[in-house]
From Swiss-Prot:
This is Aminomethyltransferase. Keywords: Aminotransferase, Transferase. It catalyses: N(6)-[(R)-S(8)-aminomethyldihydrolipoyl]-L-lysyl-[protein] + (6S)-5,6,7,8-tetrahydrofolate = N(6)-[(R)-dihydrolipoyl]-L-lysyl-[protein] + (6R)-5,10-methylene-5,6,7,8-tetrahydrofolate + NH4(+). GO terms for molecular function: aminomethyltransferase activity; transaminase activity. The gene is gcvT. GO terms for biological process: glycine decarboxylation via glycine cleavage system. Belongs to the GcvT family.
């Protein structure tokens, strides 16, 4: 299969990016080194090419009412200029994908617009399914990225840098807020959301291919560290942010995944999967996603068995060495009875049981 390439591919390669296959794309896994990139984001600012992700625009009459049929979160909690994190469900209450929904307000007297950012691995299937559901309701579903660039600028210096580039104060742009910015030397207005996947403050910017290439070079010239998928993974895992296909999938309910806060059963809306989630809420999950810290230096990886008293009771979904905490961390599913802070478990790593303890998530939170 021929891998797709983003408009920043050549710039990433020229900048020393080591390219690897990911979700049908050839993407940089690292540049200067995972630890260095991770620390750049935690301490200053880093940038990521995330142009492999899907970006859809829904436009038409009452788009929130229409999309509400597909998600369990109350979309009417957000207004124009705001966004929320939520999930798409199947009829069994399993998670099809997670996404961010941006409310773009009214297009005219009769139509509104939403922007959805979806995962690369699910983008084709999501787009087809959403289009099948939305078009009968009179909405158009279009590929907003359309060969363009999605760039994530993350870290404590990211917003001050954007303020400098735009000449605007962003002090009134809250987390999960969004607006259009005019950036110095960039030809077109830039859709900018104060969102991210690192546990740090930051923004995600949607640009044309030419504008994205120019902004990448501007940021490089200002000393911003380019970062790859490796650092993106360690950063999101320290922040205990889910990765679809690893920490949750179509067989996982939001209650099991620790995302029950996204489910608003008080809404009088018969969204996809509602009946299954009502039953799941009543019975309670038999397993839960927990955070683990491991003793020693061995790293737990996806699908490693979790043990209790020598018996396999669960499975690791994601694991890494935490550059910030300087110890191994992991996410894992375990029986609800063992999903308690302080529970002593172990993870089988290369045939040996490594002691582990259930700890509070996230592993890292900016103070």
């Amino acid at each position: 299969m021929t891998l797709q390439r983003t408009p920043l591919h050549q710039l990433c390669q020229d900048g020393g990016g080591r390219m690897v296959p990911f979700a049908g794309w050839e993407m940089p896994v690292q540049f200067s080194g995972l630890i260095q990139e991770h620390k750049a984001v935690r301490e200053q600012v880093g940038m990521f090419d995330i142009s492999h992700m899907g970006v859809l625009r829904l436009e038409g009459p009452n788009p929130k009412d229409a999309l509400q049929q597909l998600v369990p979160s109350d979309l009417h909690r957000i207004g124009p200029g705001e966004a929320c994190y939520t999930v798409l469900l199947n009829e069994s209450g399993g998670i099809r994908d997670d996404l961010i929904v941006y409310d773009c307000g009214a297009v005219d007297a009769e139509r509104g617009a939403l922007v959805l950012v979806i995962n690369a691995a699910c983008a084709e299937a999501d787009t087809a399914w959403i289009r099948d559901q939305m078009e009968p309701a009179g909405l158009t579903v279009s590929d907003l990225k359309a060969g363009g660039v999605l760039l994530a600028l993350q870290g404590p210096q990211s917003i001050p840098l954007l303020e400098e580039l735009s000449g605007e104060s962003l002090s009134d742009l809250p987390r999960f807020g969004h607006r259009t910015l005019s950036l110095k030397d960039i030809a077109h207005p830039v859709f900018t959301g104060r969102t991210g996947y690192t546990g740090e403050d930051g923004a995600e910017l949607l640009l044309t291919a030419a504008d994205g290439q120019k902004l990448w070079q501007i940021l490089l010239d200002r000393g911003v560290s380019p970062c790859g998928l490796g650092a993106r993974d360690t950063l999101r895992l320290e922040a205990a942010m889910h990765l679809y296909g690893m920490d949750m999938n179509a067989e996982t309910t939001p209650f099991e995944a620790g995302l029950g806060w996204l489910v608003h059963l008080e809404m009088p809306v018969d969204f996809v999967g509602r009946q299954a989630l009502e039953q799941a809420a009543e019975s309670g999950p038999t397993k839960r996603l927990v955070g683990l810290k491991l003793q020693g230096r061995a790293i737990a990886r996806h699908d490693y068995p979790v043990l209790h008293n020598g018996e396999t009771v669960g499975v690791v979904t994601s694991g890494t060495w935490s550059p910030t905490l300087e110890e191994p961390i992991a996410l894992a599913y375990v029986p609800t009875a063992l999903a308690k802070l302080g529970a002593e478990l172990s993870v089988e790593i290369r045939g040996k049981a490594q002691p582990a303890c259930v700890v509070k998530r996230p592993f890292y939170r900016r103070s």
